[in-house]
């Protein structure tokens, strides 16, 4: 018997012409067999290949009559793109696929859905095996400095309940990092480990994208930036005081001192001490102000296409 719950599946697309057809057929087949009602939302992050064309050419192979392609105006990246897709979704549960690469089985999808239906609002799935060194270091560092000691890992897919998704969508965070935001939602979370059935080539971010995302996440979900500012301000303040004290000692102990040296040193010492203290205070207020006033949209949609297999 099919499940009565309405589910949405949101998938990220970017230059996936080699894998999108297999992914879409597999996903559609699974949802058709498992649920009475479902929708598939494909977020096209300004692909430059034939990703969308392949979907349109093979639409008659699909069972669903509710396949939506969300075309973004320019390349936004994974997190803003998935935000666009999840905001459009209407399902009681929402599957999120960060890639069209398939290295899991339907059993994995069943397992995360069953956990979600039995009390866990956010359930992620991650492959068994060693993580990339860079990812491992990033997650360990984020756990150390984040507000809630976030324990994150590389998740390839997840399912989220409607109430958890609504809470996360209501957050005013401009840095949208779903893994952290779901943990901050306060709802029960769980993870499922699966054994990859094959090696799947996953979409790769450029180095600059990864570094930018890592920096945004660390500074958005911790007070590391403020701590660094305060520590540096304090160090330079103490250094300036030390130089001022040294200038006074030199003036009192040496018989001959270069004219104006003491006055200049004291002036620079006091001046820079004040500047560094003020910079530390301003840094705090600027951080707070920027968080409040930056109200730019997280994504821009160019068009929405509804794929109808009967057309």
Give short role names for the model-derived ranges:
Residues 1-29:
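N-proximal low-complexity "stem/linker" segments adjacent to membrane-targeting elements
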Residues 19-21, 49-58:
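Acidic helix N-cap motif at the loop->helix transition within catalytic regions
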Residues 36-47, 70-71:
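Short beta-strand/loop segment that forms part of the nucleotide-sugar
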Residues 44-52, 101-102:
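A conserved acidic beta->alpha catalytic loop
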Residues 72-89, 107-111:
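Glycine-rich, basic loop-to-helix element that forms the pyrophosphate-binding segment
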Residues 94:
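Short aromatic/hydrophobic "clamp" motif used to bind/position activated sugar donors
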Residues 107-122:
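Conserved donor-nucleotide/metal-binding helix-loop-beta segment in metal-dependent transferases, i.e.
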Residues 163-224:
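Catalytic donor/gating beta->alpha subdomain of glycosyltransferases that bind UDP-sugars
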């Amino acid at each position: 018997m099919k499940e009565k719950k309405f589910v949405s599946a949101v998938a990220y697309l970017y230059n996936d012409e080699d894998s999108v057809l297999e992914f879409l057929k597999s996903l559609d087949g699974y949802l058709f067999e498992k649920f009475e009602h479902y929708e598939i939302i494909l977020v096209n992050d300004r692909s430059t290949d034939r990703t969308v064309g392949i979907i349109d050419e093979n639409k008659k192979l699909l069972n669903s009559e509710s396949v939506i392609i969300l075309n973004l105006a320019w390349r936004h990246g994974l997190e803003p793109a998935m935000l666009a897709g999840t905001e459009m979704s209407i399902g009681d549960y929402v599957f999120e696929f960060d890639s069209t690469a398939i290295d899991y089985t339907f059993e994995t999808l069943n397992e995360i859905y069953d956990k979600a239906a039995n009390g866990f609002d956010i359930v992620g799935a991650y492959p068994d095996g060693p993580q990339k060194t860079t990812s491992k270091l990033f997650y360990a560092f984020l756990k150390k400095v984040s507000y809630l000691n976030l324990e994150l890992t590389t998740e390839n897919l997840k399912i989220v309940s409607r109430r958890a998704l609504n809470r996360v969508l209501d957050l005013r965070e401009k840095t949208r990092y779903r893994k952290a935001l779901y943990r901050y939602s306060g709802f029960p979370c769980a993870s499922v480990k699966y054994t990859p059935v094959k090696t799947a080539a996953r979409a790769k971010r450029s180095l600059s994208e990864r570094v930018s995302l890592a920096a945004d996440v660390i500074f958005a979900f911790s007070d590391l930036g403020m701590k660094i500012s305060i520590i540096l301000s304090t160090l330079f303040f103490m250094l300036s005081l030390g130089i001022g004290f040294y200038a006074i000692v030199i003036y009192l102990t040496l018989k001959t001192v270069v004219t104006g040296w003491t006055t200049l040193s004291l002036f620079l010492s006091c001046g820079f001490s004040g500047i560094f203290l003020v910079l530390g205070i301003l840094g705090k207020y600027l951080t707070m102000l920027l968080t409040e006033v930056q109200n730019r949209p997280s994504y821009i949609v160019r068009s929405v296409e509804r794929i109808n297999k009967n057309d």
